Curated annotation (Swiss-Prot):
Name of the protein in its database record: Exosome complex component Rrp41
PANTHER family, A to Z: EXOSOME COMPLEX COMPONENT, EXOSOME COMPLEX COMPONENT RRP41
Any GO BP: gene expression
Keywords from the named record: Cytoplasm, Exonuclease, Exosome, Hydrolase, Nuclease
GO cellular component assignments: cytoplasmic exosome (RNase complex)
Protein source organism: Pyrobaculum calidifontis (strain DSM 21063 / JCM 11548 / VA1)
GO molecular function: 3'-5'-RNA exonuclease activity; RNA binding
The UniProt record lists the keyword Oxidoreductase: no
């Protein structure tokens, strides 16, 4: 295992000063892309994801449409300037293709695709800045963009990450912890339905640490959910004030 440039955990605090069970600052804005049907920007600390939703609209080519449900397509992409690493090819990387599939599968349980037969919903996600936990920030952004577009949903899907750092379970991995930690677990969670839609494991986890991590993930997701709800409410209260003058 590579040695980190600074201690990841010291005197009970992480390298960025957080406690093990503490999220970075969460910032959420809804309706940020004017030419999309729905959009959201989500930041977990320095990690920032923007999602834009287009649809529902007619499926083209038509032979790909389904008679009893809609089709959701998700594209995850990291902007060339999102990391310090040089990106030489504009084509999607294998990692981006894999994460796009993972995010689609994590969103589908929340979206009532049966309401949109023979239609498609396109979700585009761009990572503007990457400092760990990009797929879970993307999941939250995409879910909010779908809600902003008025897509029928069973619940919001909130993404958080948990990991193992020096044997300690921590919430919301930053880039340093992502690169040098002993394990990570991205999670997608629907707080109202209390249902997981994404659960991936990397590293060696004992049963006890895994269960501890699940509990911490739920705690983090419920916190992000409150911030997300407030962002949605603020947008539509502002619209109501513009329309009704109150």
């Amino acid at each position: 295992m590579k040695k980190p440039p600074v201690p990841l955990l010291q005197n009970g605090l992480r390298a960025d000063g957080r406690a093990p069970d503490q999220m970075r600052e969460v910032q959420i804005q809804v309706g940020t892309v004017s030419n999309a049907d729905g959009s959201a920007v989500v930041s977990y600390g320095a990690t920032t994801a923007v999602a834009a939703v287009y649809g529902p609209r007619e499926m083209h080519p038509r032979h790909l449409s389904l008679p009893d449900r809609g089709v959701m397509r998700v594209r995850y992409h990291m902007a060339p300037f999102s990391t310090k690493d040089e990106r030489k090819s504009p084509t999607p990387s294998r990692r981006e293709i894999e994460i796009s599939k993972v995010l689609r599968e994590a969103l589908e349980p929340a979206v009532m695709l049966e309401q949109y037969p023979r239609s498609r919903i396109d979700v585009f996600i761009e990572i503007l800045q990457a400092d760990g936990s990009t797929r879970v920030a993307s999941l939250t952004a995409a879910s909010l963009a779908l809600a902003d577009a008025g897509i029928y949903m069973r619940d919001l899907v909130v993404g958080v990450s948990v990991g193992l750092v020096d044997g300690t379970v921590v919430l919301d991995l930053n880039g340093l912890e992502d690169n040098y930690g002993e394990g990570d677990m991205p999670v997608g969670y629907m707080p109202n339905l209390r249902r997981f839609t994404l659960l991936q494991l990397d590293g060696a986890w004992t049963r006890e640490k895994f269960l501890e991590a699940l509990g911490l993930a739920v705690k983090g997701a419920e916190y992000v959910y409150q911030v997300a709800r407030e962002a949605l409410k603020n947008k539509y209260m502002a619209i109501a004030e513009e329309i009704y003058g109150r």
